[in-house]
Amino acid sequence: MNLIFMHDVEGELVAVNPEYVTFVETDIYEGKHVTMIYFTNYKFAVTESFETVVNALNGWRKRT
């Protein structure tokens, strides 16, 4: 399993399992631009840019 590590809006490092990501979009959370990562049953916001998240997911898909 290849995890991608990103920072959530609290500044904590979180592990994202790309295999279960269903949707990614930009949003505003507490006045800050964030990237929302959606999974089957939940979602969370990370501070990395949309482009960074998409590139990481695409890089993972090319390796698998």
Segments the model singles out, each with a brief description of its role:
Residues N2-V14, E19-T64:
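Acidic, Ser/Thr- and proline-rich intrinsically disordered linker/docking segments
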